[in-house]
Amino acid sequence: MKILAICNQKGGVGKTTTSINLAASLAYLKKKVLLIDTDPQANATSGVGIDKAAISQSIYNILVDEVNINDVIIKTAYENLDIVPSSIALAGAEVELVSAISREQRMKNAISEINENYDYVVIDCPPSLGLITLNSLTAANGVIIPAQTEYYALEGLSQLMNTFNIVRKHLNSKLDIFGVLLTMTDSRTNISNQVAEQVREHFKDKAFETVIARTVRLSEAPSFGEPIIEYAKNSNGAKQYLALAKEVIERG
């Protein structure tokens, strides 16, 4: 089971969009996928058509109350795709976990109890480097970093790499940079091309070949509670995320 944390402490880089659409594209390619939403905004939850208001238990109950993960998993309307939803209650979890025993291991322990045979677990991390993200990185065996092709992108990445190295040293020696994904690209602008070049130079073969362009369809899909592959199957966004999913499978 490959456990991939989609992580960047910088907001607005296409993290949740990538979590939803990578998970849905892997499921479309007949892989059994569990999406775990660990962002208190719960946008990955609503993005796959789950009503946030109708949820009785969420990732909050798993991390704070140590509820069994199998009791929280929900089947989505999409074949091969299940979700552990998030809720606004998670916003207070950081404080509640501070004094908890083995606080960084809660997610890892929960995932080890999963009954289903998932091929992939995709974790949507919150846009911060707090305890929830640490839990995700401790549980994962790979990190996918979405990086927006804009001026400050590399600055944010160096901060994230710092955290990655700390987690690797103290909490999870098996953690690996699975890939860096260029998002919201616009090949018509110099800055987009320059940043893409810098990221590829720095991360070499860790940078995915696939890039995700800025498109209207991709930004519309979440408000309809659908992954792009359902909302606009023939759009560029759908094709790009499908290509990314194939690259992820190829990388093992």
Predicted features by range, described:
Residues M1-G252:
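P-loop NTP-binding core
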